[in-house]
Amino acid sequence: FNLISFKTAVENVELPLFYQGVSRKKRHQMAMEYLDKLGLADWAEHYPNELSGGQKQRVAIARALITRPQIILADEPTGALDSKTSVEVMQLLKQLNQEEGMTIVVVTHESGVANETNKIVHIKDGIIGQIEENLNHDASPFGSGGLMK
């Protein structure tokens, strides 16, 4: 997750805004908002070694989102999370896509996570296979027809 071990969760999330020249008060407020969205407000003053793997992952997600990038590359964004938190993270990513126009590219082996996306690109043995629209979120985990090509 590349969290800085001697900085608290909130300080880790604030860091990109520090380099953008955002005031201390504003970056702290924004970082707390993102930690709250990810269910970590109570853990803001804890250091990475005091957090679970899932909590560390959510801090890293908050840090990635705080600058409101145009594109997010999310490699297994729910990998270390429990099912409830996984749903919350995917809802947040969908919300950012719909409301703020962010492009979200999710890499996952989990069909349930893939099914939350609008388009699924199947890759097998490093080769792009089928690309399917998934606006109704009812895709088969193996592509249309149930087979990967």
List each language-model region with its residue ranges.
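ABC family nucleotide-binding domain
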Residues: F1-I123
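Conserved beta-strand-loop-alpha-helix hinge in the C-terminal portion
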Residues: I127-K149
